[in-house]
């Protein structure tokens, strides 16, 4: 694997942002009834995976995937709260904390 460079972290950050955008567009698509948002969601997912493919050139796949998934979930929760008024219950918060702890453990392993 190539030596870590910040450009790979930037690709990972872009992949995370695009995943969040895809999830928000998916919500706006209302089950693909609003086709433009559904298509935008699909385009964002494709772009996210393209960015992810660049990130794994300089960061281990296991680390990239854990960070992408974890930050994507956490940020999507935040977007759901801000944009749609969705809230987590106690079990949801515990799950989020466990998710973040798992991401840290994968990074430190």
From Swiss-Prot:
Subunit structure: Forms a complex with MdtJ.
SUPFAM superfamilies: Multidrug resistance efflux transporter EmrE
GO terms for biological process, alphabetical: glycine betaine transport
The keyword Mitochondrion belongs to this UniProt entry's keyword annotation: no
Physiological role: Catalyzes the excretion of spermidine.
Statement: the UniProt record of this protein carries the keyword Membrane: yes
Membrane topology summary: Multi-pass membrane protein
Record's protein name: Spermidine export protein MdtI
Recorded superkingdom: Bacteria
HAMAP family (alphabetical): MdtI
Membrane-spanning residues: 6-26, 36-56, 64-84, 88-108
Periplasmic compartment spans: 1-5, 57-63, 109
A cellular component term, taken from the record's GO annotations: plasma membrane
Pfam families: Multi_Drug_Res
Sequence ranges on the Cytoplasmic membrane side: 27-35, 85-87
Species annotation: Shigella flexneri
PANTHER family, sorted: SMR FAMILY PROTON-DEPENDENT DRUG EFFLUX TRANSPORTER SUGE (PTHR30561), SPERMIDINE EXPORT PROTEIN MDTI (PTHR30561:SF6)
Keywords, sorted A to Z: Cell inner membrane, Cell membrane, Membrane, Transmembrane, Transmembrane helix, Transport
GO MF term (any one): spermidine transmembrane transporter activity
Compartment(s) of residence: Cell inner membrane
Family assignment from sequence similarity: Belongs to the drug/metabolite transporter (DMT) superfamily. Small multidrug resistance (SMR) (TC 2.A.7.1) family. MdtI subfamily.
């Amino acid at each position: 694997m190539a030596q870590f460079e910040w450009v790979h972290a930037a690709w990972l950050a872009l992949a995370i942002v695009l995943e969040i955008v895809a999830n928000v567009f998916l919500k706006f698509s209302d089950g693909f009834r609003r086709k433009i948002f559904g298509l935008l969601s699909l385009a964002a997912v494709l772009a996210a995976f393209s960015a992810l493919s660049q990130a794994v050139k300089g960061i281990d796949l296991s680390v990239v995937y854990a960070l992408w998934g974890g930050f994507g979930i956490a940020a999507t929760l935040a977007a759901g709260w801000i944009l749609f008024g969705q809230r987590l219950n106690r079990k949801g918060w515990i799950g989020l904390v466990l998710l973040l702890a798992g991401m840290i453990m994968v990074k430190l392993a």
